Amino acid sequence: MSIVVLKLPDVKVKSETRPTHCPSCQGEILQRWGGQVRRVRDPQVSSAQVYRYRCCRCRHTFRHYPAGVDQAQQSQRLRKLAALCWRLGLSYRGIAAVLAAFRVGISRMSAWRDAQEMAGQLKRRRIWKPVRVLGLDGAYVRAWGGVRPVLVAVDLGEKQPVAIGYVDEYNPQAVRRFLEPLVKRLGVSVIVTDDLVHYKTVAEKLGLEHQICQFHVRRWVGRTLKELNSGLPQEWLWVIDEIKKLMAELPLEGSKRFYELWKQIPIGRHGRMHQPLSALDQLRQLLLRLSEHWPQYRVFDWQPDVPWTNNGTEQVIGRMKMRSRTVRGYKTQPGLLNGLMLAGTSPE
């Protein structure tokens, strides 16, 4: 059984060091200018000694707090603990009840603000962190009286969410507006997505390598071949076996081979508009699609750090959906995006 250790910030009663410089002018000659005992909301510490210092250069005075204490009434440890409790499934009312058992009283709104603060810290921590391989996928969550679309971007190296946008993945213009700043800021060079055609269009416009999730590809190809197996003429069943072999081996020349197979299938729809496709016509379409998208199926083969599936993104979205089912519904767009960011982040 695996054990997860969650480290919370330490809270000191008194600062063990003096400040090294003035925050205004960076002056190094500082004079202690009084102090006071401040009450703190924390499970273990009830008060802390806060000193004020005066800079001898600019005469600016400032407070110097002990570790784990800042301007807020709650300690950093309590705020992180409240956000962690929400991440693990407690409601804001439940968080207040649990902390009351430790003789620390906070309101539901304080717990909500703690969760929003933690989500903001996660965003700021990752806003400039380089990401080479980015996973993208859409999700639908319950918010303000309906089901809302969101687009989730995940660092597939660390399996952590990077950004979440209120974007419909079926709108290529919106996807590009969401993705382009991330590409420029983080240095993204490869995206991993499902087989939705809009992602291919956006990747080409932004000059990105595009890996299509092999799980999605093999699933829809397998379903299509199963349907065609019963409708194809007997003399063309060997093509199905050839497709299965190519999908299993993923050879470099697969695109050329699919195109050769496509040219061998006779055209059977001349003059038959608005009629259902025959099994041979469906086979031709399948071969042409596989030939055109073959480079996007095997980027992982020549770039070792690119995964061949988008499972990392799916896992993050799974955590988001599990938490969204236990909340009453997000009321605002910022609350929705912050809640999903916090829920999708695995404990560090």
Regions found by a protein language model. Give the residues of each.
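Basic, short loop/linker segments at the boundary and entry of helix-turn-helix/winged-helix-like folds
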Residues: 31-85
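Short, cysteine/histidine-rich loop/knuckle motifs that typically chelate Zn2+
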Residues: 23-27, 57
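Short, charged amphipathic recognition helices of the HTH superfamily
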Residues: 88-99
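Acidic/histidine-rich catalytic cores and adjacent linkers
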Residues: 189-196, 200, 205, 234-348
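Cys/His-rich metal-chelating microdomains
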Residues: 28-29, 61, 98-101
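Short metal-coordination and nucleic-acid-contact micro-motifs, chiefly zinc-binding Cys/His arrays
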Residues: 14-21, 48-51
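RNase H-like nuclease fold core
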Residues: 54, 101-202, 209, 289, ...
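Inter-helix linker motif
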Residues: 207-227
